[in-house]
Amino acid sequence: MVLTQLRIASRRSQLAMVQTNWVQAELEQAHPGLSISVEAMATQGDKILDVALAKIGDKGLFTKELEAQMLVGRADIAVHSLKDLPTNLPEGLMLGCVTEREDPADALVVNQKNAEHQLDTLPEGAIVGTSSLRRLAQLRHHYPHLVFKDVRGNVITRLEKLDAGNYDCLILAAAGLTRLGFGDRIHQLIPSEISLHAVGQGALGIECVEGHPEVLEAIKALEHKPTAQRCLAERALLRELEGGCQVPIGVNSRIEANELLLTGMVASLDGKRLIRDQQRGPIDRCEAIGKELAETLKSQGAGEILAEIFAAVRPEA
């Protein structure tokens, strides 16, 4: 069966549309005869901006509405920031493609008042804006003298709040800033020794309906195998820990020769307990490496930390 048209479901946030438009352009270049349309929509995570993400709940916060469009036959694929895509997908859907990763690091963004500071020179009581429990826990561990405040909204809104003086600095994904044209606002890339990034951060995941080989073949033109292998390991670790996008689990992965080196971290919300370890193995065992590292972290107490966090941030009824 020859594929003649492709319907993409996307979040309608500015960053999501930049990413989806890139996917559309790349697919049109790879398949000149293919007619591609985009349907943009708001997800639950886009609509609820006055509650911390972890309190809303984690299952499909930024993906469920897009998946519903595919399941009822109104869309063929959905484009996600891979870090937002749950590791367990609805029956009938699959992760069909992972694109080449941008720099997955977290970035420090400062206002003019703090232009002379790096993360480790911020004064006591400086207000750091982040909506991520992962960043919060790691930064509390290393910088207990700083004050952390939740920040919601799209990237532009967050930058406006920063420049208005509501925060001294923000911690954001470097990849998102770069894709939106705000790479010049990156004041410092935070070393992985301080902040391990989110699972899948910096990569795009293209979700599709199972049983449609022509769609899968079309989107595979955008697949970047080394990124996919790294992200498979990261997602296997997250799945094995039964974590989600809104818990303090951080990772870093590297491919060295034919081996994959995966580092993983679980921390308590107050940052006082932080468990970190790594696993190395042949790259064709990427998912097994993720599972094995998860078991190692569990043996060191990660399960107990996560159980406490799930109880503390359980979504409000």
From Swiss-Prot:
Reaction(s) this enzyme catalyzes, per UniProt: 4 porphobilinogen + H2O = hydroxymethylbilane + 4 NH4(+)
Modified positions (S-(dipyrrolylmethanemethyl)cysteine) in chain numbering: 245
Entries under PROSITE patterns matching the protein: PORPHOBILINOGEN_DEAM (PS00533)
Pathway membership: Porphyrin-containing compound metabolism; protoporphyrin-IX biosynthesis; coproporphyrinogen-III from 5-aminolevulinate: step 2/4; Porphyrin-containing compound metabolism; chlorophyll biosynthesis
One Gene Ontology term of the molecular function aspect: hydroxymethylbilane synthase activity
Keywords in alphabetical order: Chlorophyll biosynthesis, Porphyrin biosynthesis, Transferase
GO cellular component: cytoplasm
Enzyme class: transferase
InterPro entries for the chain: HemC, Porphobilin_deaminase_cofac_BS, Porphobilin_deaminase_N, Porphobilinogen_deaminase_C, Porphobilinogen_deaminase_C_sf
Matching PANTHER family: PORPHOBILINOGEN DEAMINASE (PTHR11557:SF0)
Note: The porphobilinogen subunits are added to the dipyrromethane group.
Homology family: Belongs to the HMBS family.
UniProt protein name: Porphobilinogen deaminase
